[in-house]
Amino acid sequence: FENKVPEKQKLFQEDNGIPVHLKG
């Protein structure tokens, strides 16, 4: 899972500047 975090994190951060996986 963590291997995909950096890739998904880049896309999620664009939502509100906050990673969606951290927002829940």
UniProtKB/Swiss-Prot annotation:
Tell me the route in metabolism or biology where this protein functions. Energy metabolism; oxidative phosphorylation
User: Where's it found, cell-wise?
Assistant: Mitochondrion inner membrane
Principal cellular location given in the protein's record: mitochondrion
Positions of the UniProt region annotated as Disordered: 1-24
Q: A biological process (GO) annotation for this entry?
A: mitochondrial electron transport, cytochrome c to oxygen
In this chain, where does the modification N6-acetyllysine occur?
Answer: 10
Cellular component per GO?
A: mitochondrial inner membrane; respiratory chain complex IV
Membrane topology according to the record: Single-pass membrane protein
Would I find Acetylation among this entry's keywords? Answer: yes
Provide a Gene Ontology MF annotation, just one.
oxidoreductase activity
User: Which keywords appear in this protein's UniProt record, sorted alphabetically?
Assistant: Acetylation, Membrane, Mitochondrion, Mitochondrion inner membrane, Oxidoreductase, Transmembrane, Transmembrane helix
List the biased-composition ranges (Basic and acidic residues).
1-13
Per the similarity annotation, which family is this? Answer: Belongs to the cytochrome c oxidase VIIa family.
What does the record give as the function of this protein?
A: Component of the cytochrome c oxidase, the last enzyme in the mitochondrial electron transport chain which drives oxidative phosphorylation. The respiratory chain contains 3 multisubunit complexes succinate dehydrogenase (complex II, CII), ubiquinol-cytochrome c oxidoreductase (cytochrome b-c1 complex, complex III, CIII) and cytochrome c oxidase (complex IV, CIV), that cooperate to transfer electrons derived from NADH and succinate to molecular oxygen, creating an electrochemical gradient over the inner membrane that drives transmembrane transport and the ATP synthase.
Q: How does it assemble?
A: Component of the cytochrome c oxidase (complex IV, CIV), a multisubunit enzyme composed of 14 subunits. The complex is composed of a catalytic core of 3 subunits MT-CO1, MT-CO2 and MT-CO3, encoded in the mitochondrial DNA, and 11 supernumerary subunits COX4I, COX5A, COX5B, COX6A, COX6B, COX6C, COX7A, COX7B, COX7C, COX8 and NDUFA4, which are encoded in the nuclear genome.
For this entry, the protein name equals Cytochrome c oxidase subunit 7A2, mitochondrial
